UniProtKB/Swiss-Prot annotation:
Signal sequence annotation: none
Keyword Ion transport: no
The species this protein was found in: Salmonella arizonae (strain ATCC BAA-731 / CDC346-86 / RSK2980)
GO MF term set: carbohydrate transmembrane transporter activity
Protein's cellular compartments: Cell inner membrane
Top-level lineage group: Bacteria
GO CC, any one term: plasma membrane
Protein name from the UniProt record: Probable sugar efflux transporter
Gene assigned in the entry: sotB
Role according to the record: Involved in the efflux of sugars. The physiological role may be the reduction of the intracellular concentration of toxic sugars or sugar metabolites.
Amino acid sequence: MTINPVSRKVAWLRVVTLAIAAFIFNTTEFVPVGLLSDIAESFHMQTAQVGIMLTIYAWVVAVMSLPFMLLTSQIERRKLLICLFVLFIASHVLSFLAWNFTVLVISRIGIAFTHAIFWSITASLAIRLAPAGKRAQALSLIATGTALAMVLGLPIGRVVGQYFGWRTTFFAIGMGALITLICLIKLLPKLPSEHSGSLKSLPLLFRRPALMSLYLLTAVVVTAHYTAYSYIEPFVQNVAGLSANFATVLLLILGGAGIIGSLVFGKLGNQHASLLVSIAISLLVVCLLLLLPAADSEAHLALLSIFWGIAIMVIGLGMQVKVLALAPDATDVAMALFSGIFNIGIGAGALAGNQVSLHWSMSTIGYIGAVPACAALVWAVLIFRKWPVTLEEQPR
């Protein structure tokens, strides 16, 4: 299909709008990682106790992704996105007003509900809205929104929290979401539900061993990453003995490296997703094993964070491409399952980091995370050799 320059420009503008929405959603998902110490101090709790909020959020997303996707499968996507943002904004206002930790957790559950639906439909929408032959690049742009949430949203949210209080951070995210909602209303066309699948799709997907193997890989590698990443801010301050300001800089470096990873994947991901993901998991293993040794200096931690950020971004993108390639006939169901399983990994990793920090030593979170990372590497090599497939091999 030939797309004239104007149509191509409009198509990219719509994908950019989704990328902005991804930035907003990922900023609020990631920002508690940089605010754990401040929230703990506010409620007179231990940092590890507050960290359970990360697990609750992730597991709510995991449990609700598929049910919510099925309940909304026939709703026009533009209208659905608008409704999601209304709940998203209201939940952030409640976060701002939270008078105790329980209320804060309730507000985060509301945000998690919107998250569960948003990430089950966004990748497939980006592919629908992208110019012909640019599906991997469209996914890369969405991932850039994710990376910018890490490189800008998370550090800025942390700085705002340091100087104006963590409540202000959540309020600012809510106001940013309001502006984004206005942009969505003005720019997005009507998007009827397509290839969303139904409960009938589940047995079909479950009979695809390549897809099931990929879901298992996702859960294991994400668990590995979040075991250490969830507690990187207190690790930098309490284990490495470095300043709170350097913790902010480190998060900035890690997120910036994620942008590099998304650019690399956008260039090579169409045909080499399997190789890129395998290399990235290898990098993740090395980074986790070297986390404690690197804590002896700011320079070593900064260098490690560059490779870590590149690795996790390539892993996330590669997994999405593989899922979409293996389930082109039920993309929303497949992505809902992917989002749920991804968040099982986040919750499991955050819980592992929580338990290690409470009952053992926070200094070992890298070593603990490296165990599932090594298992993920072996599994990745096995399944990618057995089931090689690329996104562009599938019919549009």
